[in-house]
């Protein structure tokens, strides 16, 4: 990714773990900008931790019927009342678990309220 195109979590407009608009989060996986790669907090953190600056990244095009070589993670959707990324490790697991049990977060989550695989 070059120029003004970046890998990043969803922009929230302030430095808070609780300033996310659910409608923006629920757009993950669809085109919503000028080419940036938007991802969950957990995925952005993984990339930051494991890919050095200047690393080459190969973008694989896929879809739900042919998801690419690494598969396709389950999509997590959040209700309009949720103002945080469910994969954000800074949000207490108890909060995620409560919202998941109440049906405000859908998708594959562990019993502790974390996204499967993290």
Regions picked out by a protein language model, each given a short descriptive name:
Residues 1-118:
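Exported/periplasmic cell-wall-interacting domains
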């Amino acid at each position: 990714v070059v120029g003004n195109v970046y890998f990043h979590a969803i922009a929230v407009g302030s430095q808070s773990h609780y300033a996310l608009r659910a409608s923006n989060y629920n757009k993950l996986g669809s085109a919503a900008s000028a080419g940036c790669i938007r991802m969950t907090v957990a995925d952005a953190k993984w990339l930051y931790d494991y890919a050095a600056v200047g690393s080459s990244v190969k973008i694989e095009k896929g879809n739900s019927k042919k998801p690419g070589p690494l598969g396709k993670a389950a999509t997590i959707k959040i209700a309009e009342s949720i103002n945080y990324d469910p994969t954000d490790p800074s949000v207490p697991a108890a909060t995620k678990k409560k919202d998941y049990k109440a049906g405000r977060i859908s998708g594959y989550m562990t019993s502790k309220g974390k996204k499967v695989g993290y």
